[in-house]
């Protein structure tokens, strides 16, 4: 007889049904040795053997393969310490679940220890995260960056009745009750089936409106295009598309191969739970580790290992799937470009979290870094896709534009020309993929170095982490260039040429932000939620910097004006008429009015800035 480590199938045998209906299973599994009291909550981990089709047990059905538990008390990610509980592992005889078979050998089970999660503990790390969420002035919320819903319905911060009637798992797409953890997120059966059909090829949906339809429990069937977009936004992904996104089952089976008994049946071996296993990390569950490679800080990896990690973090290609009808119009062109940008932003957040060391930064720093460089990264990706296509911009495999095709959009031709020129320079340098991914990571980590000064010791420490990560990525780029076979002098020149192009990309990004803001102001195109928040974050940040610059300039002008006025009062008069004018009450009144007006302007700028 073989045992399975996954949830029991629907067509279970009577013996398996008896296992599920056996009374008092949990008291037998978890004895009093663990010190669990009545207020202890056992939270089923969403990452089990079948990650995309896991359904939490309902009623009396208990699947011993799905009772992997986790807790922030012992999570290395959250910084908690907990005494080892390996001594509490209780080897169980299979007779607890089903009677012994007369002919087959009975497998022995080794149940993983539960990790107690008490609601009464002071969870410092989570409280700090919530403080960031409440106090942050950023338009891009931390919940959007890391997928953590503020109302706790994602399962990371469950209510005390998580195992009973108070189950608070809701579908991340339509907010209906979730039937399980499917394709990387908690979702209902309807959205699970819809996403499954869509990734199998039935995804040529077109929104009849403006691609901003509301998707909820009552309106989820009204627009398939917006529903699919919402699925991607919340982090649903096809398991097995990329190697680093392979299922948890595949990773576990590589480490724990099944043992065959004498009858040829596979006996599932379930040992100690391993905290660093590769599993699909969606934006809805940011606090789980990414694996050994991404868990450690980037400076602990060799340059070759770091380059490989960044290469594997690259997101997949995105398709528009909604061909633009020719001739192009300003509205249709901008709608397609913003649609692609919004999809890329969703994947960009997942990509950033896979950069080694990025998730170890504070939430506010993660948000700020992405806010400062999102368009730079999008434009660098556009150049990389276009480097082998002279004279064309490859926004996606199904959206390739010539220079002249951008004439329908007002003000975009200058940006197109700059994009083509920078892409041509990358083509001349024969940019390699390893160099491209290193430059991309450098843009992310270097984006906020000069945007604000650290105010607190925590800010200084966090800034140090970012700089150390940036140094590691820089070393990785230098190592990549050293493998080209060039001389040391030529390697230095190539490094300088590549880094100098980053300033051109930043200039392009500023032009793009300005143009996108103009299109938004003219109501040419309606922006999607995430793209709109990113744009507003850039706009508000630019306004703050402009206000600070204006205030400094006004103060300087005031000081210079005061010095000039005092100097002019002390200079001897060359003419009698000038002397009379200088001592006249009317002239002194004019000077006083000028100083008063400048002081009033300074005060108004101070108020606006505050």
Swiss-Prot record:
Domain of life from the UniProt record: Eukaryota
Organism classification: Eukaryota, Metazoa, Chordata, Craniata, Vertebrata
Coiled coil: none
Biological function: Binds estrogens with an affinity similar to that of ER-alpha, and activates expression of reporter genes containing estrogen response elements (ERE) in an estrogen-dependent manner.
PROSITE patterns: NR_LBD, NUCLEAR_REC_DBD_1, NUCLEAR_REC_DBD_2
Compartments, record wording: Nucleus
Cellular component terms per the entry's GO annotation: nucleus
Tissue/organ expression: Predominantly expressed in pituitary, telencephalon and hypothalamus as well as in the liver.
Full protein name: Estrogen receptor beta-2
GO molecular function per UniProt: hormone binding; nuclear estrogen receptor activity; sequence-specific DNA binding; steroid binding; zinc ion binding
Region (Disordered), start-end ranges: 566-596
Protein family (similarity comment): Belongs to the nuclear hormone receptor family. NR3 subfamily.
Comment on protein domains: Composed of three domains: a modulating N-terminal domain, a DNA-binding domain and a C-terminal ligand-binding domain.
Region (Modulating): 1-170
Originating organism: Carassius auratus (Goldfish)
Domain NR LBD: 302-538
InterPro entries for the chain: ER-beta-like_N, ER-beta/gamma, Est_rcpt/est-rel_rcp, NHR-like_dom_sf, Nucl_hrmn_rcpt_lig-bd, Nuclear_hormone_rcpt_NR3, Nuclear_hrmn_rcpt, Znf_hrmn_rcpt
Keyword Nucleus in record: yes
Zinc finger regions, NR C4-type: 171-191, 207-231
GO biological process entries: cellular response to estradiol stimulus; estrogen receptor signaling pathway
Signal peptide: none
Assembly behavior: Binds DNA as a homodimer. Can form a heterodimer with ER-alpha.
DNA-binding region: 171-236
Bias (Basic and acidic residues): 577-596
Keywords: DNA-binding, Lipid-binding, Metal-binding, Nucleus, Receptor, Steroid-binding, Transcription, Transcription regulation, Zinc, Zinc-finger
